[in-house]
Swiss-Prot record:
This is V-type proton ATPase subunit E. InterPro entries: ATPase_E_C, ATPase_V1_Esu. Keywords: ATP synthesis, Hydrogen ion transport, Ion transport, Transport. GO terms for biological process: proton motive force-driven plasma membrane ATP synthesis. Belongs to the V-ATPase E subunit family. One of its GO terms (cellular component) is proton-transporting two-sector ATPase complex, catalytic domain. One of its GO terms (molecular function) is proton-transporting ATPase activity, rotational mechanism. Pfam families: vATP-synt_E. HAMAP family: ATP_synth_E_arch.
């Protein structure tokens, strides 16, 4: 569990750094959009006043209101894009873990699960060569020492995941892919990221 806490802490720290950068870019874009829309709104307003002062005020207010609504929607979209980017970056950082860290992560994650010890480990085609027989033997020895079966093996099946693993047995899967782990933390971390990005 401490491995997951360290991972969570690292994701939050990286997210905060990425958030500052993304927020700066988003604010520049927001100012640009607002300035352009306000100028356009003012121009439309002046043209309308020429034709009819009574209608001009109503139309100008409508243009400004629509512009404000568009800006608000654009800001919401930009915020969601930035949040998604932070989580995507977290998955990429996990994918780029050094081999030893990656194998330790897999080992510690499997050993922390309540499993019987005779499951199959499904990984991505890219990760298949990272897990060798000696790693599986070590893992099985540790499972045996915990009173579990020592029959864990690498599956012949591959999955299109970005890293991590899926444990499979009798039609039941435990998804510990990097995407699933980051998604499982999303609800917990999203509010912290929003506060870091937009407060």
């Amino acid at each position: 569990m401490s491995n997951l806490e360290n991972l969570t802490s690292k994701i939050i720290e990286d997210a905060n750094k990425e958030a500052e950068k993304l927020l700066s870019e988003a604010k520049k874009e927001e100012n640009k959009i607002v300035n352009e829309k306000v100028k356009k709104g003012e121009k439309v307003k002046e043209q309308i006043i020429e034709k009819s002062k009574g209608e001009a005020k109503t139309k100008a207010e409508r243009v400004i209101s629509n512009t404000q609504l568009k800006v608000r929607n654009n800001k919401l979209e930009a915020k969601q894009e930035m949040i998604n980017k932070v989580f995507d970056e977290a998955v990429i950082k996990l994918q780029n873990l050094p081999q030893e860290e990656y194998l330790n992560f897999i080992k510690n994650s499997i050993l922390s699960l309540d499993i019987e010890g005779d499951e199959e480990i499904i990984v991505s085609p890219n990760d298949k060569n990272k897990i060798d027989i000696s790693f599986i033997l070590t893992l099985n020895n540790k499972l045996k020492a915990k009173g579990k079966k020592d029959l864990l093996k690498i599956s012949n099946e591959n999955r299109n995941i970005k890293g991590g693993f899926i444990l499979y047995k009798n039609g039941i899967e435990i998804n510990n892919s990097f995407e699933a782990l980051v998604d499982s933390l999303r609800d917990e971390l999203e509010q912290e990221i929003i506060e870091a990005l937009f407060s």
